[in-house]
Amino acid sequence: TFPAILLALLFSLMDCFYLALWLWFVAQTSLEWLFYCLEYLNILWLNIPADFYLFSGIGWITIIIIRIEFWRRFSFTIVIIITMLFSPIYKQPDYLWRVDMLDVGHGLAIVIHNGKSAILYDTGAKWEDSSAAEQVIIPFLQWHNLNVEGIIISHSHNDHIGGLSYLQQRYPNAWLMSSSTNLSNDYNCLADHNFYWKHLRFNVLWPTQLVSDPNNGDSCVIQITDGQFSVLLTGDLERKQEYDLVVKYKRNLHSTILQTPHHGSTTSSSYPFLNYVNPSNALTSASRYNPWRLPSNKITNRYKALNINYYITGKDGQISLFFYPTSWQQKTMRQDINPRWYHDWFGSLSFYE
């Protein structure tokens, strides 16, 4: 392709029009075949746990040591080095539990994990030939070597339920919880049907009844708490249902972290609701430059006026929360986990990059 393009440019400068035209045709044809092949090469991509790279590195180091007979003179040193390399594999995380809001574009996918077990809250969107589950959720789960024990669906809109069928194929033993009568639920999402998982309590706050096709107002609202810190998951809950929750639960709505209802739309995040939840941080799952212009500037300013720290996946990338015995920490992909190299020099930008 590249030689054909260079020759085409050269012959164009030499006024060899027909020869240049033929070379442009060759370059175009080669690119068409390349992209055709790339579509099928996608199946060869392997998503592997992070530990695999460590094992691979240890293997290569071992081969090099044997080949150069380094081990004969420094055997004790080699044993120490290999022991140090293996130590991260057996190191337990210092946090008790973790919540990740994945960057799935316009949609929602949240992973709650404790050790190597996980529960999913929503599964992102599905489109014609793929889904957020295939492109984002599965790679994340495999990278962290997580087993999905359960899936909670907030409601039936594609950007929340789209990846469900694919995830159920990959994790057939995972239980399902929703407020829909059209799904084969293992557990129904109904207010006050609370449950425990690991050391976490899942307080189910909404809805009060099951429906065949849950809409925004029927979103499965769950407050996850370890007794000290809590995360409130709201799906696409709207203003009317927020008022109902305020009337019923009042100060019990207070949570450390709030998943912003309905991607930061003006249909949600009412003042009374925010005052009672009173979170430290609010997390919004919304794509950059989406056609709905979410989150709304009006809502963003409302959170800021209430001194609530506001984060958006479209700007901050994946948002990760780590909960410890007496504290918690938040990290974002673009600022803390994997920042752009120039942020170290010039600092982070306040606008979309």
Task: Annotate each language-model stretch with its function.
Residues 1-100, 111, 281, 302-311, ...:
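Transmembrane helix-bundle segments that form internal channels/tunnels in multi-pass membrane proteins
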Residues 30, 102-103, 112, 122, ...:
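Divalent metal-coordination and catalytic microenvironments
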Residues 108, 144, 149, 172, ...:
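Envelope-exposed proteins and targeting segments
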Residues 133, 137, 154, 162-167, ...:
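Active-site-proximal loop/helix segments of hydrolase catalytic cores
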Residues 94-139, 143-144, 215-238:
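Conserved beta-strand hairpin/beta-sheet module of binuclear metal-dependent hydrolase folds
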Residues 4, 100, 119, 152, ...:
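Hydrophobic/aromatic beta-strand patches that form the interior of the parallel beta-sheet core
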Residues 175, 179-203, 210-216, 288-353:
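Binuclear metal-ion centers of metallo-dependent hydrolases, dominated by the metallo-beta-lactamase
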Residues 150-152, 156-192:
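Active-site HxH/HxHxD metal-binding segment of metal-dependent hydrolases
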